[in-house]
Amino acid sequence: MSSAPETSDADHVSTAQPALGIPRPPSVGGISSRMTDVASEDGEQSQANTGISSRPPQSQRSLSRRGPPPARSSITAHSQMTSRPGSSASRLSRSHIPSLTAQGFFRPMSSQRLQAHRGRPVTKETATPSEDWNDQLDQNRQSIISNGTFPQSSAPQEEAPPSRGTEFTDPIIPDRNTSNASPFGNTTSRSVGESAKLLHDRDRVYKITPQHLDLGANHNIEKSDPSQRSPLSFLSLQNGNTAPEPRDNRAHERLSSADSSPGSIQKQHHAPTSANLGKNYEYFTGNTLFFGGGRFQNSRDKPINIATGIFVVLPSALFFAYSAPWLWHHISPAVPILFAYLFYICFSSFIHASVVDPGIIPRNLHPMPPPEPSGDPLLIGPPTNDWVMVKLATSDVAAMDVPVKYCKTCNIWRPPRCYHCRVCDNCVETLDHHCVWLNNCVGRRNYRYFFAFVSSATLLALFLLGASLAHVLVYRAREGVSFGSAIDKWRVPWAMVIYGALAAPYPASLWAYHLFLIGRGETTREYLNSHKFAKADRHRPFTQGNIFRNWISVLARPRPPTYLQFKRPYQEGDQRLSAMKRKDRPRDVEAQADIEMQHVPPTPRQG
C-alpha cells in the first residue's frame, strides 16, 4: 500500500469507482469515509461523492429552500436524475465541506407515512423527471447505512423493495401529539416514534392468523364512528388516490401508542376472576364466630348468651302453659296478649343485640412500616397516641381535644370513642362495654338493641311477677280457699312470682344505669375512665347539652351500615381481611410450638 503512486484528487474521483468492483464503506453521520470525496475549493473541477450527496453540485438543492429533499439513492438513481435542471441557489449553497447533517434528520417519518410505505405495492415503472418526488422515495432505500456507492454499470439494476422507512426519511416534520396511523383507523393516538419496534417479533413474519382466532383484534368497530382527522392525516393520500390501496398485512405489528382521546373504542379485556373464593367472614381474623352464611356472629368465648336466652324463654313458656289460659278466661284476654308482646320485644332485641355486628372497624387500614433488620433495636418507634379536635354541640365556636390511639393489633388509628375489645379481639366503634350475657360487644350498631333488651326484660320480669301473683290471688278469692291452698293448687304460677322477683332487679338496675349514661352523653368506658381524674378535669365532649337531646341522639339515630359486609363474596387482595381462610390457618400456634419443643427420641442406628 505504501508503494502505490500518489494521484491527484480529481483523477482519483474519476477513476477509483470504475476500477474497483467492491462497494465503498458507508458514510456515517454525513461525513465521508474517504478524504478524496471532499470537493475542492473551486467547486468546478471535482464534486463531493458521499453517501448523502451522490449527484453533481449543479443538481443539489439548497437546504434552506422549502420543498421535498432529494432522494439519497445509488448511482442508478443518480443517472436518472441528472436531467433535472439545477437550482438557482445551488451555487450559493456549495462549500468545500460536505453537509454534516442528514437532510432527513429534521424530517423524521411519521407512523402514517411508515404504514403507507409498507402497504404500497411495488411498481415496476421507471420514474421520470416529471413524476412526483414521492415515487423516488418509494423505489429507493432511504436509509443512510444502505446508501453505499456501487460501481456504475450499464445493466439495468433490480429495483429495491419498498423501504420500511426510518425517522430520518419523512419529508414533513410530523406532529408527535396527534399524528399516528391507528390500526383501528378511527382515533388518533400519541405516537412513540420508535420504528425499530416493527422488528420486535420476527417469529410472526408471514404468518397470517385467521380473524376469528385473533384474540387481540377488535371485531366490533362501529363503522359509523367518524375518524378524527388532522392536517397531517392526509399524508397517505399525496398521490391523489381517494380510495385506500390494498395492504399486505403479513409481518405487520401494531405500533405502541397511548390513547389521546377519552372516547377510545378499544375494549378493555378484564382478567377472568378466580373461582368461588368464599365470603368475607371466612377470611376475618378477629375472635368472632359466624353462622348463617355470615348473617349472624358472636364472640368466640363461653356461650353464656345461651343461658340468657333460656332465662327468658323458659319462664315465659311456663307462663303461657299455666297462667295464660286461666287469665284469658277469668280476668281478661289482654293480660296474656300484653305479656306475649313484651316477650316478643325482649327476645327479638336479645337476638339482635347478640348476633349483630356491633360496629367492627376494618383492620390494616394504617399499617406501620416494618422495622429495618439492620436498625437499632433500642430506637424509639413512631408515636401511637394523638389528639383530635372535636367541635362541641353546646357552642358554635368551642372545641375540645380528645385522645386517639393507634391499635397495634388491628393496625389502625382508632377514631374517637373507639376501643379494642380483648375478648372479641376487634376495634369497635363507640364501644360501650363487652356484655357477657350477650357474648358480644355493645357498640354503635347494637346499643339500641341492648337498651331495648334491658328495658323489655325489666318490664317482662315485673309483668311476670304481677300476672302470676294475680293468678294466685284471684283464684283464692274466687274459690274461697286459703292462701296456702291456692299456692298448693297453682305451684308453677307461684314459682314464677319468685322468679320474677329475683330476675327483675338486675335488668332494672342496668336500665336505670344506662338511662343515666345516655343522659350524660357518655359510654360506660368513658364514665369509668373519667373517674381517674378530679372532678374539675372531667369533660364530656360528646354531650348534646341536655338529657332529652342526649336520649334522642342515641335512641333515635339510624343504625349505620356495617364496614366489612361479611356476607359479600371475598375479593382476592383485600387488605382488611386475611389471605387464608380461618379453617386453613393453624388453630393454636402455641400448641404447635409446644409440639416442636417436645423431646424427640434419637433415631436408632442401622446395622
From Swiss-Prot:
Autopalmitoylated. The DHHC domain is required for palmitoyltransferase activity. GO terms for cellular component: endoplasmic reticulum; endoplasmic reticulum membrane; Golgi apparatus. Belongs to the DHHC palmitoyltransferase family. ERF2/ZDHHC9 subfamily. Its EC number is 2.3.1.225. Residues 245-256 have a biased composition (Basic and acidic residues). It is an enzyme of class 2 (transferase). Residues 53-66 have a biased composition (Low complexity). Residues 405-455 form the DHHC domain. The active site is at C435 (s-palmitoyl cysteine intermediate). Residues 73-102, 125-156, 176-192, 227-242, 257-272 have a biased composition (Polar residues). The chain crosses the membrane at residues 306-326, 331-351, 450-470, 498-518. It is found in: Endoplasmic reticulum membrane. Pfam families: DHHC (PF01529). GO terms for biological process: protein targeting to membrane. It comes from Aspergillus fumigatus (strain ATCC MYA-4609 / CBS 101355 / FGSC A1100 / Af293). The keyword Transmembrane helix applies. This is Palmitoyltransferase erf2. Disulfide bonds: none annotated. Keywords: Acyltransferase, Endoplasmic reticulum, Lipoprotein, Membrane, Palmitate, Transferase, Transmembrane, Transmembrane helix. It is a multi-pass membrane protein. Residues 327-330, 471-497 are lumenal. Residues 1-198, 217-272, 570-607 are annotated as: Disordered. It catalyses: L-cysteinyl-[protein] + hexadecanoyl-CoA = S-hexadecanoyl-L-cysteinyl-[protein] + CoA. Palmitoyltransferase specific for Ras proteins. One of its GO terms (molecular function) is protein-cysteine S-palmitoyltransferase activity. Residues 1-305, 352-449, 519-607 are cytoplasmic.
